[in-house]
């Protein structure tokens, strides 16, 4: 029996696994991804526009202490949790890395924001992150697509916040507001945590793993 030889084996095909496999494949590395679930088609396998009572599956039992409420959405399949995440994509700031310096609590990381900023740039270009450059110290600006338009209720909230000296900004999400060759732009259906049938929202299966498989250097 012939045995395939791989340079790297990655366990899990979510955001980390998919991104790593994609970048290794571009550098000529032969990669195997070990995934415990099936392949999922985000366009057809989710009841994206259905109500919860229309779902054919039952809730997965979870261990809960007493009556403490805990909601956990899980995904086992190619793409992992990226199939269900809401895709809010915020950069950590220098304050996050240097908690003791700024807040007097915790420990400072041995790296700072400037060390990983170039990697934020790279991944934002790859997956497509929408938002505004708001110039906030705690939420560093990135490489953004145009933001998702505010709803009427958002405008009301923003006016109220301004009257109190606060600020409301557009959400920063790994969601396309401008179409690409392989993905459509968001049409604001509000079901980001149920697949995304136009792949406007990032998922590692479509954005990273599928192209990597087409290169012939990645096997799931």
What are these regions (language model features)?
Residues 11, 33-34, 169-171, 220:
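General beta-strand structural signal in soluble alpha/beta enzymes
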Residues 102-219:
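Conserved redox-cofactor binding core of oxidoreductases
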């Amino acid at each position: 029996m012939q045995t395939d030889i791989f340079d790297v084996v990655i366990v899990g095909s979510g955001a980390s696994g998919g991104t790593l496999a994609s970048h290794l494949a571009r550098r000529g590395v032969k990669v195997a991804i070990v995934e415990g679930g099936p392949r999922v088609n985000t366009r057809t396998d989710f009841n994206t526009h259905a109500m919860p009572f229309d779902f054919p599956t039952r809730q997965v039992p979870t261990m809960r202490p007493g009556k403490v409420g805990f909601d956990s959405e899980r995904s086992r399949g190619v793409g992992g949790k990226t199939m269900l995440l809401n895709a809010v994509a915020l950069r950590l700031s220098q304050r996050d890395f240097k908690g003791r310096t700024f807040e007097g609590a915790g420990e400072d990381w041995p790296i700072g924001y400037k060390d990983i900023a170039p990697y934020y740039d790279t991944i934002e270009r790859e997956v497509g992150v929408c938002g505004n450059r708001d110039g906030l110290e705690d939420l560093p600006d990135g490489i953004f697509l145009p933001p998702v338009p505010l709803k009427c209720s958002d405008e009301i909230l923003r006016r109220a916040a301004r009257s109190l000296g606060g600020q409301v900004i557009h959400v920063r999400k790994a969601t396309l507001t401008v179409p690409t060759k392989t993905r459509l732009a968001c049409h604001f259906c509000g079901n980001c945590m149920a697949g995304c049938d136009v792949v406007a929202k990032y998922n590692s299966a479509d954005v990273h793993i599928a192209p990597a498989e087409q290169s012939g250097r990645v096997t799931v």
